[in-house]
């Protein structure tokens, strides 16, 4: 699984001109599911997301998690994160999980985040979405479950 996470002061996702998910302060996560990803990957990523200290404390140091600042998470599926642009001019999506598996693991990731008690909004899997956000910082990170160490 690959995730692009952005610290936001607000974010929303629209489908067909209607807002389907919105948050105030928190994290926008764009999630791509790849072939070979498992529920273990979803669990690792959900745990990492809930505890990642990317919000500033009173001293201005990134020392607080989304839970500690009483923020929210907006999770948006984005299969293009599995795209490979190494050859030619058109991305290859050969490594993207099939839609049924991608949806199952995306839904599992969302369920696991919600189980932490963090308010979580979502987009709609496979929909053509418009994502609006105010990136706070900007603060953006890329997480890849395939490159995690065994100690994290």
UniProtKB/Swiss-Prot annotation:
<dbReference type="InterPro" id="IPR023509">
    <property type="entry name" value="DTD-like_sf"/>
</dbReference>
<dbReference type="GO" id="GO:0005737">
    <property type="term" value="C:cytoplasm"/>
</dbReference>
<dbReference type="GO" id="GO:0006399">
    <property type="term" value="P:tRNA metabolic process"/>
</dbReference>
<dbReference type="GO" id="GO:0106026">
    <property type="term" value="F:Gly-tRNA(Ala) deacylase activity"/>
</dbReference>
<dbReference type="GO" id="GO:0043908">
    <property type="term" value="F:Ser(Gly)-tRNA(Ala) hydrolase activity"/>
</dbReference>
<keyword id="KW-0694">RNA-binding</keyword>
<comment type="subunit">
    <text>Homodimer.</text>
</comment>
<comment type="function">
    <text>An aminoacyl-tRNA editing enzyme that deacylates mischarged D-aminoacyl-tRNAs. Also deacylates mischarged glycyl-tRNA(Ala), protecting cells against glycine mischarging by AlaRS. Acts via tRNA-based rather than protein-based catalysis; rejects L-amino acids rather than detecting D-amino acids in the active site. By recycling D-aminoacyl-tRNA to D-amino acids and free tRNA molecules, this enzyme counteracts the toxicity associated with the formation of D-aminoacyl-tRNA entities in vivo and helps enforce protein L-homochirality.</text>
</comment>
<dbReference type="InterPro" id="IPR003732">
    <property type="entry name" value="Daa-tRNA_deacyls_DTD"/>
</dbReference>
<dbReference type="GO" id="GO:0019478">
    <property type="term" value="P:D-amino acid catabolic process"/>
</dbReference>
<dbReference type="GO" id="GO:0051500">
    <property type="term" value="F:D-tyrosyl-tRNA(Tyr) deacylase activity"/>
</dbReference>
<comment type="similarity">
    <text>Belongs to the DTD family.</text>
</comment>
<dbReference type="GO" id="GO:0000049">
    <property type="term" value="F:tRNA binding"/>
</dbReference>
<feature type="short sequence motif" description="Gly-cisPro motif, important for rejection of L-amino acids">
    <location>
        <begin position="137"/>
        <end position="138"/>
    </location>
</feature>
<keyword id="KW-0378">Hydrolase</keyword>
<dbReference type="Pfam" id="PF02580">
    <property type="entry name" value="Tyr_Deacylase"/>
</dbReference>
<protein>
    <recommendedName>
        <fullName>D-aminoacyl-tRNA deacylase</fullName>
        <ecNumber>3.1.1.96</ecNumber>
    </recommendedName>
</protein>
<keyword id="KW-0820">tRNA-binding</keyword>
<keyword id="KW-0963">Cytoplasm</keyword>
């Amino acid at each position: 699984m690959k995730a692009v996470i952005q610290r936001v002061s607000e974010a929303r996702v629209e489908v067909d001109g209607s807002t389907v998910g919105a948050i105030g302060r928190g994290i926008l996560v764009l999630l791509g599911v790849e072939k070979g990803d498992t529920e273990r990957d979803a669990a690792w990523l959900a745990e990492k997301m809930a505890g990642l200290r990317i919000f500033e404390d009173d001293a201005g140091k990134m020392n607080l998690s989304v839970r500690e600042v009483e923020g929210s998470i907006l999770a948006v599926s984005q299969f293009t994160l599995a795209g490979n642009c190494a050859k030619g001019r058109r991305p290859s999506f050969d490594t993207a999980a099939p839609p049924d598996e991608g949806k199952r693991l995306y839904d599992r990731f969302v369920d696991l985040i919600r189980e932490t008690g963090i308010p979580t909004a979502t987009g709609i899997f496979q929909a053509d979405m418009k994502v609006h956000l105010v990136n706070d910082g900007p603060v953006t990170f890329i997480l890849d479950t395939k490159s995690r160490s065994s100690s994290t």
